[in-house]
Amino acid sequence: MVRGVVLFPGAGSSRDHAALLAIEKELSPLPVLRVDFPYRKAGKKFPDKAPVLVQCVKDEVRAFAREIGCDTTDLVIGGRSMGGRMCTMASSDIEDALLIAGVVCIGYPLHPPKKPEQLRTEHLPRLATKALFISGTRDEFGTPEELETAFALLPSPPAVQFIEGGRHELKGHDERVATLLKDWLRTV
């Protein structure tokens, strides 16, 4: 049984992103922690390098598990765009994998817009946890076809939900995203 959820924002937003707030509301009374990355807390606009962000994910998740009195394996982690990607990297780290119940990625940034050759998939074959990917069918960071090809790299098939007409930001779909996550948590 999932004991809590830890969420991280995308590169251009904060822990107060509408989607993360909607998820917290939908999952109540389940404990939800929304986290800002260190660069955001320092007032910087541009993200730190991936190792710093991944370490932040590990540190925050482990601290939250201690705070609510559970193991990290009782938690689901994830987030929007870069936040979700960093969570997949933390849980597939070769040297110090963060053991969790599952990971959710909202708008996984498979590649930079208009640069489909720059795939961010190197770690996916090591992602050995339950996973939910939610993306729009018009996401500039990965088409449904590109994402399905990338998801085939995972050791076991993830749950995938595409929101018709949604772009990367999934504006106007926050409640739908929250409901999809809540429904998926019942399977974890």
Describe each model-derived feature in a short phrase.
Residues 2-74, 85, 89:
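Serine-hydrolase catalytic machinery in alpha/beta-hydrolase-like enzymes
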Residues 6-10, 107, 135:
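The conserved beta1-alpha1 loop
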Residues 166-176:
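Catalytic histidine-centered segment of alpha/beta-hydrolase-like enzymes
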Residues 180-188:
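C-terminal alpha-helix
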Residues 57-126:
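Primarily recognizes the serine-hydrolase "nucleophile elbow" in alpha/beta-hydrolase
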Residues 16, 140-146:
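Conserved alpha/beta-hydrolase "acid-adjacent" motif
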Residues 11, 137-139, 165-167:
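Acidic beta-to-alpha connecting loop that harbors the catalytic carboxylate
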Residues 127-128, 133-135, 139:
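Short beta-strand/loop motif that positions the catalytic acidic residue
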